[in-house]
Amino acid sequence: MANTKSAKKRIRSDARKHLRNQSYRSRVKTMIKKAELALANGVVDEAALRMAYSTLDKAAVKGIIHKNNAARRKSRLAQKAKKVALAAQAGSAA
């Protein structure tokens, strides 16, 4: 247990930061799931992708996730979107 006043304050501030970070991580996961759900249905939802990219970038800037983690997730989303777009294009051409 913390003995000093500053250690007790640090525990309180860490708890607040933990809640904030947890909330933002949840938001990131939700946005990615929305984008992936649209892609799974064969639709490239530009708005959902943009929101997912934006949320990932903001999380990286705030230090909630590492910038390489954000880049990797964005890249994987883009790959999936490209695959769906090509499949839709091939389907409409055939």
Curated annotation (Swiss-Prot):
One of its GO terms (molecular function) is small ribosomal subunit rRNA binding. Residues 1-23 are annotated as: Disordered. The keyword Transcription regulation does not apply. GO terms for cellular component: cytosol; small ribosomal subunit. One of its GO terms (biological process) is translation. Belongs to the bacterial ribosomal protein bS20 family. Binds directly to 16S ribosomal RNA. This is Small ribosomal subunit protein bS20. It comes from Chloroflexus aurantiacus (strain ATCC 29366 / DSM 635 / J-10-fl).
